[in-house]
Amino acid sequence: PYTYWFWMNGNITKEGITKDLEAMHRIGIGGVFNLEGGTGIPKGPVTYLSPEWSELKAHAIKEAARLGIDYVMHNCPGWSSSGGPWITPEYSMQKLTWSETEVAGGKRVDTLLLRPVTELGYYRDIAVLAFPSFKNGKPVGFSDWQLLNNSVFNHRGKIGIQTYDKEQVIRLEDIIDLTNQVDSLGRLNWEAPLGNWTVIRLGHTSTGRKNCAAPDTGVGLECDKFSKQAIQLHFNKMMDLLYPLIKPYVHQIQIGLEIDSWEVGMQNW
């Protein structure tokens, strides 16, 4: 059988590593999943990916090979999912973000479009689109509303597909692509047709999600799962350091990387 083997927030020594592995060997443990956590544990002296850390990792792999214990390491600090301090916002998980600007047509529109909400100061435009506005500019009043009963149903409604009025559907042929009429600062210059228009400035930004339960010196952004460059950046950061440590023992024991769980939310870009 395999077991989890946590190194807690940099509190690691060669003596402790040897004693742990020898104890596992005595009771028949055949392999370890070596993860590094830091939830509520005081910070120890070893910094993640430091030369001292590499020396301890090499010692652990050597001792595991000596005892015939397979060695599998989590692919990043923490137990979820694939990230670290080396991931910068442009290589982090991405999400769509947008702003809406209402403009009146029948004239040339020269206006600075609102910048969408961003995370970590990182934003890139994708497209600028316009469609006939459903808004008439009249506010919805509710001053005469009165709360009759402060209660909620004790059950959920039926799960199903929500239907919408056909008038709410934006027809594809009514959408105008204005991407090429917006400069790098987000200023729109457009000869707008008659009518009221909603202009969407669509872009992407970081989700801001970080690896879960990592040691203090290993906390960082999650890599972009839709980007080959981001995944290679993350993988190489680990393997460039680990491969020389692993290579002498690959024919003695099973050595690998694993992703323990997914607790970093979703991305849609």
Predicted features and spans:
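Acidic/histidine-rich, surface-exposed loop or edge segments in extracytoplasmic proteins
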Residues: 1-6, 37-43, 211-223
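Mature extracytoplasmic enzyme cores
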Residues: 12, 16-18, 23-27, 31, ...
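Short beta-strand and adjacent tight-turn residues that come in two discontinuous sequence segments
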Residues: 34
